[in-house]
Every structure is written in C-alpha cells, then in structure tokens.
C-alpha cells in the first residue's frame, strides 16, 4: 500500500496543502519548525485516528481556525481507499472512508497501515514500561480489531475497579469479584496476544539486528508479566490471572489500586544478554529501536500481505552512515516518507527517482 495523494486544510501550520506522493521514496527537506513533521503527523493520524505527538486533537488545528481537514488517497493491492478526517475544536472528529461515515475508531485500523520512526521512539528502549506497553498496544490494535476491543474493555473495567478501590468502604469485598472476573477474561486475551507478537518480534528482530551490526550483536525480547507464575502456559492464562487477582485482593484494597495485570507488564530488550535499557550505549539503544521498527514492518507484511507506509521523521541524522545505508537499502518495496534538514549525507543512498519536497513556513514545493 502507499499514499498516492494528500490534502490538508488548516492542519497545524498549513493553510492548504495538496501533494501527490511517489510510491517509493519521498523526502521533505527544510529547517526546523517549518512543517515537515506535520506532513508525517497527518498521515499517521489518518492511519489510527490519533497523533503520535499530542493527545490533544485541538492542537492539530491551525491557529484561529475552527477545524482542520485531512484527505488521503490510499492505493492498495486489492481496493483503493479514500480517508477523510475533520477535526473540530471541541475535541470531536468526523471520519469518512470512501465517503461513508465510521463511528468506531477500530473501523479505521488497517485501511492505511503506517510504521513511524522518530527520535521520540528511543523511549521504547530507554524509558519506563508504559512506553513499551503503548508500542505493543498500538501495533497489535493495527493488526487486530479484537485486540483493540479487549484493550478498551479491559481499561474500562480496570478504571471501574480502581474507582471502587479508591472509594473504599465495607461493600468493596462483596462487589469487587465481578470486576476481577472481567479483568481476567479481557486481560488474559491481551497477555496472550502480546506474547505472540513478541515471539514474532524476537524471530524477525534477531535476523535484522545481526545484519545491522554485522553479526556482532544478538538482540532478544522477553515478555515480563506482573503475574508471577512460571506455569502460565497459553491455555491457563485466564485461570492463573484470576487466581493472582484474588490472591492480591486484600493488598489491592489496602493500597487502593490494582497491582497485577497487563497494565503493569513490560518487555525486556537484551543485546548480547545485557539489559539494553539499563546498560546499553546510546548507539545500541538507537540500533535496538531501529530493529524494532523494521521488524514491525515485516510483521505487518506477514499478517496482511503488503508492507505499510514507513515514516522516518528526522532520524537519519541521528544514525551513522552504516545505519543510514541499511535503512535506505532496505526500503525498495516500501513507500517511505522522510523528513530531514538536508540530503547531502544520504543522497548517495537514494534512488534517482526519489521525490524531493522543499518545506518552508507551511508551504511545500516539489523540487
């Protein structure tokens, strides 16, 4: 799949933008704060209905305007699609696919699959578990509407259980069991799918990482569950999860929060059997992030039969020449949209037919 056409109205610093993209490589060049990343953000937003930069949709609307508009024409192997999203200042959004309104965000998933790699993605490797959980949840939601459903339901039950715990009172022990059973049902499905995804990430990521590092480093990914039970196989996750919740019930009532479940889980990233988050160098952490992103591309290809669109947001300048070469030689069958301040260092790796755009102060001109 690839983005054939992009139209923006009052999106960030763009009054209006109309561009046709090449199905292979597109490069947006410009100084900082000119609008390069805004182009990538609009494409990412059209893929899952949320930004990778902000949780406040109103920030996507140009200053002193009442709404913003995104229109994207997606060319696919089977059936082309047109996505239109209007973002309103009140925080609402209207989404149309082929001129038909969709009410559930999950209906948008899979129409335009995107993998983004930005400097902020280093947080997947080096920051707290919440960043790694977010990565898993986004990737799995793109691939499975059922996963997204389980995630939404789990979060809803978790919030209700935590509200009950915070409220306290004599009735809590009598009521809490209803929430425990629902948490175990939805949560076990989440854990099961996360573990499956990490196994794929492990298998594909190992090969990619060895190639990037010239066989010098071996990477591994291991799921870390807050449910401390070594006998938790695939068929018994729900049963054991429920046992753990019940076992921790009195402690949860005392502490007033839910202490076990996928909302507390993590995954370990090791390079040569050493924890990359704690002991990896900045270069190793960057390479691990690169591996994760490129493995994600292959996982999506394996699952749906075609590569997603790859968005590279000002990351090439952060990588050495060997990593730059790896990226630009690995994207021949993938539409890639790159932002950078200049192409001098990467020009030798680019195809002659790469489409170049100059971005300045919310204006985008094809070179």
Curated annotation (Swiss-Prot):
Q: Which Pfam family, an example, fits this chain?
A: SMC_N
Identify the CDD domains for this entry: ABC_RecF (cd03242)
Instruction: List the GO biological process terms.
Output: DNA replication; DNA synthesis involved in DNA repair; double-strand break repair; SOS response
Q: Which SUPFAM superfamilies match?
A: P-loop containing nucleoside triphosphate hydrolases
Q: So which domain of life are we looking at?
A: Bacteria
A single GO cellular-component term on record = cytoplasm
Detail which positions bind ATP: 30-37
Molecular function terms in GO for this entry? ATP binding; single-stranded DNA binding
**Predominant location category:** cytoplasm
- Keywords of the record: ATP-binding, Cytoplasm, DNA damage, DNA repair, DNA replication, DNA-binding, Nucleotide-binding, SOS response
Q: Keyword Transmembrane helix: yes or no?
A: no
Q: Give compartment(s).
A: Cytoplasm
Task of the protein: The RecF protein is involved in DNA metabolism; it is required for DNA replication and normal SOS inducibility. RecF binds preferentially to single-stranded, linear DNA. It also seems to bind ATP.
Q: Which family does it belong to?
A: Belongs to the RecF family.
Q: What is this protein called?
A: DNA replication and repair protein RecF
Traced from the root, the source organism's taxonomic lineage reads:
Bacteria, Bacillati, Bacillota, Clostridia, Eubacteriales
The record's gene field reads: recF
């Amino acid at each position: 799949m690839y983005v054939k056409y992009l139209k923006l109205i009052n999106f960030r610093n763009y009054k209006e933008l109309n561009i046709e993209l090449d199905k292979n490589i597109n490069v947006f060049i410009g100084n900082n704060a000119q609008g390069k990343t805004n182009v990538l953000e609009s494409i990412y937003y059209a893929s899952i209905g949320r930004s990778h930069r902000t949780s406040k949709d109103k920030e996507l609307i140009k200053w002193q305007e009442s709404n913003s508009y995104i229109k994207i024409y997606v060319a696919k192997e089977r059936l082309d699609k047109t996505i239109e999203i209007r973002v309103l200042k009140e925080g609402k959004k209207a989404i149309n696919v082929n001129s038909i309104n969709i009410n559930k965000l999950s209906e948008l998933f899979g129409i335009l699959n995107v993998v983004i790699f930005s400097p902020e993605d280093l947080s997947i490797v080096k920051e707290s578990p919440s960043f790694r959980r977010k990565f898993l949840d986004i990737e799995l939601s793109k691939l499975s509407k059922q996963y997204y459903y389980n995630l939404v339901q789990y979060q809803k039950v978790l919030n209700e259980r935590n509200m009950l715990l915070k409220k306290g009172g004599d009735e809590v022990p009598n009521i809490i069991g209803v929430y425990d059973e629902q948490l175990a049902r939805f949560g076990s499905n989440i854990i099961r799918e996360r573990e499956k995804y990490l196994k794929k990430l492990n298998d594909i990521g190992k090969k990619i990482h060895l190639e990037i590092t010239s066989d010098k480093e071996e990477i591994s990914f291991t799921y870390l569950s807050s449910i401390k039970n070594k006998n938790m196989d695939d068929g018994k996750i729900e049963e054991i999860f429920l046992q753990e919740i019940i076992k921790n019930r009195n402690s949860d009532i005392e502490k007033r929060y839910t202490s076990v479940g996928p909302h507390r889980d993590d995954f370990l990233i090791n390079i040569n059997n050493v924890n990359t988050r704690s002991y990896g160098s900045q270069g190793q952490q960057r390479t691990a992030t690169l591996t994760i992103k490129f493995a994600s591309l292959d996982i999506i290809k394996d699952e749906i039969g075609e590569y997603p669109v790859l968005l590279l947001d000002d990351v090439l300048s952060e990588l050495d020449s060997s990593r730059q070469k790896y990226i630009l030689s690995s994207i021949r069958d993938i539409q890639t949209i790159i932002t950078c301040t200049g192409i001098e260092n990467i020009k030798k790796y680019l195809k002659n037919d790469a489409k170049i755009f100059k971005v300045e102060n919310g204006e985008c001109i094809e070179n």
